[in-house]
Structures are given as C-alpha cells and as structure tokens.
C-alpha cells in the first residue's frame, strides 16, 4: 500500500528566480511557481499512529514546511519508472534502522505547482517539463497517487534466443542492431561458427555478454591490432609500444598491465588503522602506491551528473580492487568540451555549431559533470586534488581538410592514487570450490550496454540505447564496500579476499567471467542469488546491467564466515552467487525457470576472437602562419585570461573535498590568498611521516591538429615540468598513465595515433627513463547527426592526457607558484626549453583569434628536458627556490600573471633577451619554467643550472614588486602595464559567471568582489598559546590512556584522521560503528569520551546528520545509552561536521543545549570545500581551554553548515549563555557573514558551539584534518610538526586526567 507525506519547500528564492528567467526566455506564460518535496512510502501493512508520527518526523528535514496548501497545476518529478534512486536506497535503510519495518521502500518526488497566464499548448508543456527534469533519470506525473507505478513489481521475464541455426547470419545481424551489440563483421562470423559447432542457438544474454566482454571498451582491439600504414606493415601494435617503456625501465614497478591499477614502490611508513581488537595503531610497513586513470566520456555526454559521478566511482573501485584489496587515497579529474557559450558572456572566438538533442551542451556538461564527479568523491571520502579543463570547438584546416574539430563528445577523466600492502600486490589463487561473491548494491535495470555503447561513435546507436546506458551513483554504498575491503586487507595474511575485480562496463557479464578466467577457472552461478531490486528483470538485465558500487570476489570457503561478519558490521550487502570450477566453462542457472540462460565454454566467450588489422594512410597538413597583424597585446592577454584552459577554475575546485584523510600536503589552492595554481598535488604517505606521493597532469590536444607526435611529446613533458615542483629525486621514480582519445577511422587519425604512440612509447619515454604501466583508450571521439537533411560532424582532436605519479621524499619541500615579497631581494629566471623557437601554432593565443597557425611547440631537446628535471630536483631538495611555475597554456605572460596572483604582488618584466616578436615571446607555449630565486642564492642556482647544461637556456626576466601592477618592457619601451587586481578580476570572470549560473548569485558576486579587492590581506594566524607545547605530555607519561569511541555510521569517512589526532593526544582510540552499539558489541559506558566523525552518514538524504540522529532517538536502547553518557559529568563529547549535525539533532537528550540551532543547507546551495579563518572566543568549553583570542585557518568541507534557529530568541540565548566558541572571520579579523570567508552564511559567522557545562562541543570545520602543520593548505612558516588545532585534542586529554 502507498502512503504519501508532504515534505519541505525544495527550491530557495534564488532557484525559483532562476527558473522564472528560463521560462521567460523560453516564452512560457508562467506567472507563479512553487516547489516542495513529496515522499512516497510503499508499505507492507498499515502503519500505527505512532509509526506514522515517527515516519513523518523522519521525513521532516530541510526548511520548515510552508503553512499553505500549494495551488496551481501540479507536475511531480519522480525517478524514472523502473529505476530506484540512491535517495530511496539510503532513506529506506534509515527507516529500517529506526525500526520501521513495515516500510518496504521510500521514494521522493519534487512537486512543482505552476500558475499560468493562459492554457499551455502540448508543445509548451513539453518545453516546460524539459526545464524541470532530466529525462534520462526522471519522469513526470500529475497526481501523487500515480506514484504507485514506482513500486509495481513485474513477473520475471525469461531469456530469448536468436535462431541462427535456421536464420543463419542474418538473424545475428538483426539482433546486433536491435540489442545495440556493436559487433564487428568478423565477430558475427565468429559467433555463427562457434554456436553452429555447439549445435544450438545463442541466448540473448550470451550474445550480450560476448558483446560487452569483447567491446572496444573492454578489449582495446585497436591498441592490440596489427597495423599497415601507407602499405607498409608495422612491426609493433600500439600496446607493444606502450609496453616497451616497461621493458626499457622496469625500475620500481611492482605490477603493470594485468590488474585494475598499476602498482609502484612506495615508502616505509606507519600506516594507521584499527586492529582486530578495535584499537587504532600505527603499523610500520611499505605503503606501495597504486595508480589508475579512467574515462567516462559517453555517459557524461548523455547525462553529465551521473555520467561523471559513476566515472569517478568506477575508477575508485578499480583502485580498491587492485591485488587482493587496496585503499584509494586521492583523486584527479579532467574535462574537455566544446565552447561553453555562457549566456551574456559569449566570447569572440565562440561561434558554436549546433548539437544533436541526445547529448548535453558543453555548458550543461561543465555545470553538472564536475558536480557529479565531486559529489561522488566527497561522499566516498576521497580528496580531489588535481585536474584540467579545456574547451575547443573550431572550424580548422587540418589533416582531413576543413572541418569542425571539438569535443561534442566530451572527455571526462577520473583518476587517482591509493596504497596497498606488499603482500597484497599480486592476486591470489582461486581454488576449485572458492565462493564467488558479489559485494555491493542490488542489480537494477540501468546502465545496460555501457561498454558497447561507449565503443560507438556518438550517433551510431539508437537514442533509447543511449538512454539505457546511463548509470546511477550511490557513493555511500561504495564507501561501505570499501570499509569491508579495508577490514580484509588490514588482516594481513588472514585477508579472506583471494581475488577481486570491480564491476564496471558490462556488469556481472564482464566481471564474473573475467574473475574466474584470470584465476584459470570456470564458474557455476545461480542467477536468482544475485541481489536484485526489480523482480521483473530478464536474465539478460540481471546479469548485464551496470548497477554501480559492486565488486566481484573469490573467497575460500573456510573464510566465508569471517567475510560475512565483516560485511554485516559495515552493513554492506553481499551475495554468494556461485563457485569456481576446475573446468573452464561458464554455467548460469535460473532457479525460477529451471533452465540455463548461459552454458558456454570460456574459450568461446574470451577466446581468440578475430584480431583486428588497421590498414590506413597517413596525411600531412600545411597550416598557415598565425596572422597577428591585427592583434593588440593587451586585448590578446585579456582574451587568453578568459579562455577556460587558462582562466581561474575555482568553480571546479571548491565543490570538491580537498582535506579528507588528513594527508593532503598540497592541494590546488596556494598561499594566503588561496589561488588555484598549484603545479602538482602532494599527499603524505601516512599520518606520521613526511614521505608522500605526488600527481601531475599534462595534455596539449590542439597541437595534434598540426602535429600528432608533438602533441603526445608535450603531454608527457608537461606532466614532468609540473611534477618537478616537488621532491622526488630520480626521474625513474615517476610513472605515467596514458589516456588516449581518438576518432578512430576518421581521415588521417589512425596513422596519427600510431605516430603519437610511437613518439612516446618507442622514443621519448625510454630516452627519459619513464614507464607507462597503466592507461586507457577511448577510440570513438566523434559526434554525427542530421539537421535539416544535412549530416553534421564534430570530431575531437587526438587527445593524449598524461597523468604522472611519483613517490615523494619530503612533502615539505614542495615549491608553489606563490611569489614572495617577504624574502628580501630576489630575481625571476626563465628556463626556456623551447630554445628561443617561440612557436605559436595551436596556442591559446591562436585559439582566441580563431586561428590554428602552422608550427606548434615541441620537445626541442630530450636531454635538456631530463637535465631540467634533475636541476629542479637539486634546487628543490636544497630549498633554493622561492617559487616555481611551469610555462604552459597561455604562455609566459599567463605563467607570470598566475605567480603574481598567488603572491598578491606586482611584476617588472623585461623581455629583450627572449626574442624579437613580443607576441611570440609572451604567448608561445614551449616547455620551460619560471623560478624565483633569492639574490643571495643566485650564483648557487646558476652553478646548478650550469652543471646541468641549462645556463644557455636561462634568461633573467626581472623582479617582483610590492605594487598592484604588472609591467612588461622591451628595453626602454613599456609594452604592457595594468593593475594586477584588474587582471585578477578578468582571470576570475569565468568562475564568477559559472557560479552565478550554478550557485547562489549573491554568493558568487561577493566572492568576485573579494578577489578583485586590492586591499585583501590574505590569511594570517595568531595563537595565544605555544603551538609547540604538549600540555598532555605529563599525563601521557603516566601510561594511562582514556578510551575514546571514534564513532561512525555508514557513510562516515573522516574517522581515520580523527582517531590519529586523539591517538597523538594520548587516547586509546577505538573504532566504534553504530552497528556495534546496535548489536551490543560495545557500550558507551565503557568510554571516557565520544567523538562523532565527519562524512555523509546515509548520504545526508534526510538532512545532514538527521538520519543518524533519528536512528538513535527512535531506538529506545540507543536513546537510553546516549542519554546516560551525555548526563555523566565525567565524559566528553565532540561532534565534527556530519558529527556536529548529528549531535545537534540529539540536543533534546544533551543537558545545556536548549539554545542550540540545527544546521541546514549552505547559503551558496553548494558543497563548500575551503580553508577558512576562525577566531576562538572566551567560553567555558573544556575543549578550547587556553585558545581564546587565537585565530587560524581550518579545513571546511560541508554542504549543510548554516545555523538555523527554531525561534528568534535562540541566538540571544546562545550569546547570553556564552556558548559560541568559534566564528568565521574575514581577512581583517572581523566576524563575517560574507562569502566565502564565511563559507555557509551562518549568522555572525557561528561555526562552533559548546553546551553549558563545557563538556560537549560541536563544530562544522575539521580540526582533525589539520592537526599536523603539513596538512594545512597554508600555514605560517614557523609552525613545526604540530598544527594549531592539535591543542584541542590535548585539552581533552588534560581534562580526563
């Protein structure tokens, strides 16, 4: 039965205003609009009054429900029929954990009420609906009762067969089109031959499974193909040339080409995690480094948010499923799209081609896609520390003549690093009888055919098949699964996982055969054992769907009980669906129909399918030199600063958590003004060392329109000039991931791809000593469609994205682009690896003037590049560089401007020594870097450059000033002069425009004003206590350790760093999951202190922290336990971020909290990840003793941190009772409500509160993520190991003595 509950208002005033503007532009006669959430409960039986009240309370979150009955025409947006939203999965979990067991499922809709000036036509209705829902993910109904269709269960469907025995090849050709299999001609022949030999017809599920497992996406046929170019047979395949890098330089690589990610040697450090007794401890061992970079281009083109989200999720699973289980650590992301054409901010180089209806626009992709990728990383608990963003769309004369080149099919790149134990690097053996398990969420009828669909050029598959290949994300589920994997690898030799793969393209139809095949086994499977949320699915849909957040594992039968216990504790769903067999044969039995939908020898599925041969011709291109006769230097610089590849990208950065783990040593934001210009990302290898890992990226795709090989060489070289800013040592420590995107089959592109791979794999990388142990290819980067009877095509340039990964010796030595004005006299030097060639082909300058040019930059001298890296490493190690920034997109002028922005300083630059042509000198994108050197170190630095054969490439540029002005001169002639603050504003315009479209425009305007303010003083810190004094030391010396419960719920992700901070303060930190309290494995009375940790409990679906709190309040046993703990005067409680929200929701059982507010959505309506300044007030909080009067930065990472009071008197009560412990302050040190100094809009900057007796504290920012100095994005140079926030944890230790 269905019960309906009204929810809170769903759209704020500014969101409704944005909608009104869109309706006006679309000429829709909407006079009024209101929207609220509506909840649908599918019940097994009628609820009692008490149960109804409980469920009603549970579904009360967000702003208070409007007191009126809405009027107007009702349009209710619901999840697409036949799918289950991730909101539903998590909300239903909460209901069950609150004892509401009659609830089969909860689902949520968004009810719009419109008033119209006149009756809408059906065409206008369609247009209206397109503005309020995503047809890929959602549907529309008009009455709440119609939502019953969401819960309808169908009878199971049987498989179908394709009659090739009588219908022959034609029958299979028809099935190929109808099922969207993307089978090649020779594969059709192969299947007809093999099934004829087996004497039976194939089932649809078998064909589908074959198509997924053998798609270009999964099998990389082009990279494994034989090649004939211009009639000449080539010696090696593309993949062999990539593998050549490993053959030439195998140093430090532990696993390559055979697993979900590659592994290289890491550092020996203290890895921090709980032992089987629950206590967190350091474990001194090798933390080897794994690396992986994936693309998710096709799903992102179709539906950007879930496409990018599941792209990140799939890559995270690849890392976790490496070896016998590993831990993902930090992520990177990248986007290439066509021109944005922002309304009201159109640029002179943008004259967009139209696009097919089935794909999203570039602007929509860049609004929704990054939010999807960030949301997944945030909720999973992985910091996103690195990225690139390029736009390109231009009619150019390239290898195939004049045509439109661009990214209508976007690149969405997701990658990262993780750590793995030495004994788990290699996968184990799969014994006969091993249990074959699916870990993770249920099968759903979504994401069908992603592998095959992404292998087709966009436009070749039917639109409804594109529709079917969109996936759905549930990162909180993936976090639960990862916690299980963590518990397994933490057992060391007792790890129950023998073999593990993630479930990606093709679903179980690809993952399970791969698992058993890689283990040299076959498998017997039971279809109906697979967890499924939809009874009516056919065998094909159950086996082949791409439901996310799943892994397949082999576990020895004797370890099954242990594995089961670990899953139950983490509330991670799993199912034993089969056993490994001696015979390499795959059988899938269906208990419902008592038949075998699959019954195939493994060698038919994964055997020697026909090998591809590419017989292609190479092409040449004659570009025309850049015409710069009409180009004005100032205008050119302004245009380049607005080009997305150069422009400030804060809008892509602050949406992503960059502090979770407590091990981030270098994120994108640099210096006291937090400017996003870091060259590389750096993490510490553990919470107790300065060893670490670094990541950087390189890509120069437009260059491939003139020279394929040069583009590939530059991508590799740029990744090296970026990562050179940190302390690596030997260049052989750097390992690369190569992601190749190409429009295979497009004129000239195949031969060009071969040239590019050869340039990198056979030549440049071996010469530099670099290895490419991992990578990915996407070979269908072309979009075709028909418009007004005419075929249109947009083809991407050959795009190689290189991601570089390396072990770091000492993360503290990383150099940033921030120019320093506080270090005495200094000089700026350019190391010009372009050797004065100053080529302008395919540069940002060319692009903003709608040109391509002729000669692009290239690697001029490989030996100089290697020497450059070695010289920078010597200078970084000796700490002789004040600042470093490589030359890249936008050229030298952009490099210098970014350094000045980071240093909030001026420049006086002289370019006479760099060449005769001003534009070529300033805008060429040849390799190189600018360094800032103290005057007193100049001769030492010149000596090092001389020893490395670089002094002839080193040019003095001028000096740094304290003025608000950037000046560039040639001799006595002033070429350029403008205020730095004005240029800073131009550079920030892109972010401002994107934030205004996507977020609260008022917040966007406030941030834009702050960026342009020449008086902005940047961050500072002042402590009223000695940062180096360990006030807990005398108590630790007694050997006594108070016990603290490091409390987490499903979806919490900040518990490791929290435990580490308390461990350092002398506590016995115990890992306590809410399931432990439910099942009485622990009781709170056995602890002296309790900390509720940050993250996304239940994915924040019923209000941040709300579901977690209500699972306590609505459970009598837990309610009593927490009430007793809070009432005990000898205990301490801390709630941070999600824990803060949760504890605030428990105020009714915490003494002295009557004045506490609750925490609601940020004013910006966006997840905010920033460093922010806070001031500590004088209160009686035991947690903040001795800290009053201090101000310092802290990590902020939340979407719902704004305080909301029940009534106006509450704020005054807080002040009267003196419970406001900390406030956000601006750079002038005043409490503020201005964004982004106050990232959530809380009144008076309130961000931390105490209860009346000082024992309980709640705070939204994260002290545990910055308890070490090294993990602060910015900090004063005189801070040593302990950060300013370590005092809070030591205060707690002193109190509990």
From Swiss-Prot:
One Pfam family it belongs to:
AIRS_C
Cite the CDD domains for this sequence. GATase1_FGAR_AT, PurL_repeat1, PurL_repeat2
Its GO biological process annotations read: 'de novo' IMP biosynthetic process
Q: Which Gene3D superfamilies match?
A: 3.40.50.880, Phosphoribosylformylglycinamidine synthase, linker domain, PurM-like C-terminal domain, PurM-like, N-terminal domain
The UniProt record lists the EC number as: 6.3.5.3
- Active site: which residues? 1137, 1262, 1264
Q: Which residues bind ATP?
A: 307-318, 678, 888
Going by the UniProt record, its keywords in alphabetical order are: ATP-binding, Cytoplasm, Glutamine amidotransferase, Ligase, Magnesium, Metal-binding, Nucleotide-binding, Purine biosynthesis
Residues that hold Mg(2+) according to the record: 679, 718, 722, 886
* Localisation per UniProt entry: Cytoplasm
Show the GO MF annotations. Answer: ATP binding; metal ion binding; phosphoribosylformylglycinamidine synthase activity
Q: Which reaction does it catalyse?
A: N(2)-formyl-N(1)-(5-phospho-beta-D-ribosyl)glycinamide + L-glutamine + ATP + H2O = 2-formamido-N(1)-(5-O-phospho-beta-D-ribosyl)acetamidine + L-glutamate + ADP + phosphate + H(+)
The Glutamine amidotransferase type-1 domain sits at 1043-1297
Family the entry assigns = In the N-terminal section; belongs to the FGAMS family.
Protein name (record):
Phosphoribosylformylglycinamidine synthase
Native source species: Pasteurella multocida (strain Pm70)
């Amino acid at each position: 039965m269905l019960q309906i509950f009204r929810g809170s208002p769903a759209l704020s005033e500014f969101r409704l205003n944005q909608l009104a503007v869109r309706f006006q532009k679309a000429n829709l006669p909407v006079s009024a609009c209101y929207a609220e959430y509506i909840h649908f409960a599918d019940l097994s039986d009628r609820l009692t009054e008490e149960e109804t009240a409980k469920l009603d309370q549970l579904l009360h979150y967000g702003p208070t429900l409007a007191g009126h009955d809405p009027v107007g025409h009702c349009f209710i947006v619901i999840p697409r029929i036949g799918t289950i939203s991730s909101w539903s999965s998590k909300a239903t979990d909460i209901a069950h954990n609150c004892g509401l067991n009659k609830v089969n499922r909860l689902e949520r809709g968004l009810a719009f009420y419109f008033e119209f000036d006149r009756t809408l036509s059906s065409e206008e209705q369609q247009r209206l609906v397109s503005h309020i829902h995503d047809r890929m993910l959602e549907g529309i109904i008009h009455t709440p009762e119609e939502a019953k269709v969401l819960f309808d269960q169908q009878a199971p469907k049987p498989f179908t067969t394709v009659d090739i025995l009588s219908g022959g090849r034609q029958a299979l050709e028809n099935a190929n089109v109808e099922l969207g299999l993307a089978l090649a001609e020779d594969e059709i022949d192969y299947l007809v031959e093999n099934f004829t030999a087996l004497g039976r017809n194939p089932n649809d599920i078998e064909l589908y499974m074959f198509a997924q497992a053998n798609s270009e996406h999964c099998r990389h046929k082009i990279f494994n193909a034989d090649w004939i170019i211009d009639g000449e047979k080539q010696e090696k395949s593309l993949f062999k040339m990539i593998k050549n890098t490993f053959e030439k330089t195998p140093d430090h690589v532990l696993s390559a080409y055979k697993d979900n990610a590659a592994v290289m040697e890491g550092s020996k450090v203290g890895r921090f995690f709980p032992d089987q007794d629950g206590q967190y401890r350091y474990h001194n061992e090798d933390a080897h480094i794994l690396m992986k970079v994936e693309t998710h281009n096709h799903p992102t083109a179709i539906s950007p948010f879930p496409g990018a989200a599941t792209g990140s999720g799939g890559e995270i699973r690849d890392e976790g499923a490496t070896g016998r289980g590993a831990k993902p650590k930090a992520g990177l992301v990248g986007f290439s799209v066509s021109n944005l054409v922002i309304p009201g901010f159109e640029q002179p180089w943008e004259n967009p081609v139209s696009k097919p209806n089935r794909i999203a626009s570039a602007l929509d992709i860049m609004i929704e896609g990054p939010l999807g990728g960030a949301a997944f990383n945030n909720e999973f608990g992985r910091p996103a520390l690195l990225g690139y963003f390029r736009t390109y769309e231009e009619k150019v004369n390239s290898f195939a003549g004049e045509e439109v080149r661009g990214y209508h099919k976007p690149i969405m790149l997701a990658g990262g690093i993780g750590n793995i134990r030495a004994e788990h690097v290699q996968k184990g053996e799969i014994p006969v009888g091993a249990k074959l398990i699916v870990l993770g969420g249920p099968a759903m009828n979504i994401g069908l055919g992603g592998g095959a669909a992404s292998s087709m050029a966009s436009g070749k598959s039917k639109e409804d098949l594109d529709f079917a290949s969109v996936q759905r994300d549930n990162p909180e589920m993936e976090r639960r699964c990862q916690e299980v994997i963590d518990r397994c690898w933490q057992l060391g030799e007792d790890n129950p996982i023998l073999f593990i793969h993630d479930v990606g393209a093709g679903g179980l139809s690809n993952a399970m055969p791969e698992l058993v095949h890689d283990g040299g086994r076959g498998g017997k499977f039971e279809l109906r054992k697979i967890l499924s949320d939809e009874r009516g699915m056919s065998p094909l849909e159950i086996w082949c769907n791409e439901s996310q957040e799943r892994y397949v594992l082999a576990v020895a039968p004797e370890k099954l009980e242990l594995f089961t216990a670990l899953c139950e504790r983490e509330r991670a769903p799993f199912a034993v669906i089969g056993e490994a067999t001696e015979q390499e044969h795959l059988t899938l039995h269906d208990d419902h129909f008592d038949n075998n939908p699959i019954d195939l020898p493994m060698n038919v599925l994964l055997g020697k399918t026909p090998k591809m041969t590419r017989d292609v011709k190479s092409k040449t291109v004659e570009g025309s030199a850049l015409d710069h006769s009409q180009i004005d230097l100032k205008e050119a610089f302004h245009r380049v600063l607005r080009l997305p590849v150069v422009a400030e990208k804060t809008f892509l950065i602050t949406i992503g958590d960059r502090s979770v783990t407590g091990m981030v040593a270098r994120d994108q934001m640099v210096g006291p003004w937090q400017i996003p210009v870091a060259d590389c990302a750096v993490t510490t290898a553990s919470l107790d060392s300065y060893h670490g890992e670094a990541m950087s990226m390189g890509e120069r795709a437009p260059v491939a329109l003139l020279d394929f090989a040069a583009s590939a060489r530059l991508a590799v070289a740029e990744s090296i000039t970026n990562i050179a800013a940190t302390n690596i040592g030997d260049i052989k420590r750097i390992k690369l991931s190569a992601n190749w995107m190409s429009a295979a089959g497009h004129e000239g592109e195949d031969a060009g791809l071969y040239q590019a791979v050869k340039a990198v794999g056979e030549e440049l990388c071996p010469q530099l000593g670099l290895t490419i142990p991992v990578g990915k290819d996407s070979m269908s980067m072309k979009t075709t469609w028909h418009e007004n009877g005419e075929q249109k095509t947009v083809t991407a340039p050959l795009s190689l994205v290189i991601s570089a990964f390396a072990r770091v010796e000492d993360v503290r030595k990383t150099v940033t682009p921030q120019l320093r004005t506080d270090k005495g006299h200094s000089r700026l030097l350019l190391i010009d690896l372009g050797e004065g060639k100053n080529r302008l082909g395919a540069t940002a300058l060319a692009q903003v003037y709608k040109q391509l040019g002729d000669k692009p930059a290239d690697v001029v001298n490989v030996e100089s590049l290697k020497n450059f890296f070695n010289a920078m490493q010597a200078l970084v190690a000796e700490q002789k560089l004040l600042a470093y920034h490589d030359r890249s997109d936008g050229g030298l002028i952009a490099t210098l401007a970014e350094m000045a922005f980071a240093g909030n300083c001026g420049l006086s630059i002289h370019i006479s020594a760099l060449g005769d042509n001003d534009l070529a000198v300033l805008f060429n994108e040849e390799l190189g870097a600018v360094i800032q050197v103290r005057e007193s170190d100049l001769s030492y630095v010149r000596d090092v450059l001389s020893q490395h054969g670089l002094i002839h490439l080193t040019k003095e540029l001028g000096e740094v000033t304290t003025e608000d002005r950037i000046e560039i001169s040639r001799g006595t002639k002033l070429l350029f002069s403008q205020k730095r603050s004005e240029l800073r504003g131009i550079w920030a315009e892109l972010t401002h425009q994107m934030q205004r479209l996507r977020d609260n425009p008022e917040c966007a305007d406030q941030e834009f004003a702050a960026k342009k303010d020449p008086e902005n003083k940047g961050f500072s810190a002042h402590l009223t206590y000695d940062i180096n004094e360990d006030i807990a030391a005398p108590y630790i010396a007694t050997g006594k350790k108070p016990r603290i419960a490091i409390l987490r719920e499903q979806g919490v992700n900040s518990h490791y760093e929290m435990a580490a901070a308390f461990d350092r303060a002398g506590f016995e930190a115990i890992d306590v999951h809410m399931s432990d309290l439910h099942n009485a494995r622990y009781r709170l009375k056995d602890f002296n202190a309790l900390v509720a940790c940050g993250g996304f409990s239940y994915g924040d679906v019923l209000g941040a922290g709300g579901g977690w709190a209500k699972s306590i309040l609505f459970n009598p046993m837990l309610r009593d336990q927490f009430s007793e703990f809070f009432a005990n005067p000898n205990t301490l409680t801390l709630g941070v971020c999600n824990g803060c929200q949760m504890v605030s929701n428990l105020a009714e059982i915490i003494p002295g909290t009557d004045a506490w507010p609750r925490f609601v959505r940020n004013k910006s309506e966006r997840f905010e990840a920033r460093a922010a300044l806070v001031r500590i007030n004088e209160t009686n909080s035991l947690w903040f003793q001795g800290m009053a009067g201090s101000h310092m930065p802290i990590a902020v990472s939340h979407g719902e941190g704004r305080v909301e009071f029940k009534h106006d008197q509450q704020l005054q009560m807080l002040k009267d009772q003196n419970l406001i412990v900390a406030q956000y302050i601006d750079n002038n040190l005043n409490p503020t409500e201005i964004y982004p100094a106050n990232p959530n809009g809380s009144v008076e900057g309130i961000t931390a509160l105490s209860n009346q007796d000082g024992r309980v504290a709640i705070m939204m920012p994260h002290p545990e993520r910055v308890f070490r100095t090294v993990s602060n994005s910015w900090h004063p140079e005189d801070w040593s190991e302990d950060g300013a926030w370590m005092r809070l944890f030591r205060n707690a230790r002193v109190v509990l003595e």
